[in-house]
Amino acid sequence: MKRVTLLLLIFITYLPAQQMDRLFWNGSDWRRLEKLADYDPELTYMMKIAYINGILDGRLFYYLKAWMIEQTFADSLYAETVDYLTPRELVKVLDNFYADPINGYIPLPSAIIISNMFGERIPMDTIDEYIRHSKEWINRMILEQK
């Protein structure tokens, strides 16, 4: 009986953490991974790689689901290149991107697109425009929630 109670207590404790929307993690969440990994660089790197691979796998999954229904729509919806950089390069670029406090509240999916834009050598005007739109979008979304 004590084991069941203990397992139930652990499950209830971790349940709210599972409900957290990790899709909208931003720079503060990205930087917090170091603290969660107890400042171990290898563990921090593995956690960041796992997050990036999860986002890319999820994107591929939903692209393929949409592609089965309507190929043209799926191709236009998922037109951004998010796999130009390797995951290792992407971690480095994201670390540098979030080192600037101004970029701290841009969601990670947008930061991944921006990082790949840097890697593809897209003109800075276009990248700055995308960053501005990302900031406006997240600001609108935050204000609508309140």
Give each language-model segment a name:
Residues 19-28, 61-146:
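Compact alpha-helical subdomains of small soluble proteins
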Residues 48-59, 91-95:
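Extracytoplasmic/secreted envelope proteins and their assembly/folding machinery
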